[in-house]
From Swiss-Prot:
InterPro entries listed in its UniProt record: Smr_dom (IPR002625), Smr_dom_sf (IPR036063), SmrB-like (IPR022990)
Enzyme class: hydrolase
HAMAP family: SmrB
Organism the protein comes from: Aliivibrio salmonicida (strain LFI1238)
Lineage summary: Bacteria, Pseudomonadati, Pseudomonadota, Gammaproteobacteria, Vibrionales
Protein name: Ribosome rescue factor SmrB
Gene: smrB
Length: 177
């Protein structure tokens, strides 16, 4: 009922007659929390700070030494080659998929950082990054970016069921909390 709708005298008396004898209930089950009023400036600063944290590890100038023969693969020092083999065979099933088709490099870098941050927050150890084949720009850059991130234990070209040559399976280290 809007504010412009007015009750006639008959309707008002009928309502009073219907609720006569009822008691007002005291609300005691829900405690209202005061809302946090963030200014737009504070929200922008927070999102900018989070974005920088997610993008921090990826440099286009640093080129890690990766194996160039055969499918793309990488294992950090101390990670068993058996883990890479399990990635290759599809033993690890990715819980998160990032589709980079149509993204520019900066956008792809930002989304990759966001995906890794999300996986760490949600304790997800395996993810799939679908860079596509196209002009090979993202196909070349994604492994270089992944190798720079300290939480990436290993990655391997995905098996056909998860994207084949157009995707990479990433194994992340989940810190104990």
């Amino acid at each position: 009922m809007s504010k412009n709708d007015h009750l006639s005298d008959d309707e008002l008396s009928l309502f009073r007659e219907a609720v006569q004898g009822s008691k007002k209930l005291r609300q005691d089950t829900i405690i209202h929390q005061p809302s946090k009023n963030f200014s737009e400036q504070q929200k922008q600063r927070k999102s900018l700070k989070e974005g920088k944290n997610e993008e921090f590890f990826f440099s286009d100038e640093f080129v890690p030494l990766l194996n160039e023969d055969g499918p793309v693969r990488y294992a950090r020092d101390g990670v068993s080659k058996y883990e890479v083999k399990r990635l290759r065979r599809g033993v690890y099933v990715p819980d998160v998929f990032l589709d980079m088709h149509g993204m520019k490099q900066d956008e792809a870098k930002r989304e990759l950082g966001s995906m890794i941050a999300y996986c760490l927050k949600e304790n997800i150890s395996c993810a799939s990054v679908m860079h596509g084949i196209g002009k090979h720009i993202l196909k070349q850059k994604v492994p270089l970016w992944l190798a720079q991130h300290p939480d990436v234990m290993a990655f391997h070209q995905a098996p056909l069921e998860f994207g084949g040559a157009g995707a990479i399976l990433v194994l992340l280290s989940i810190p104990d909390r």
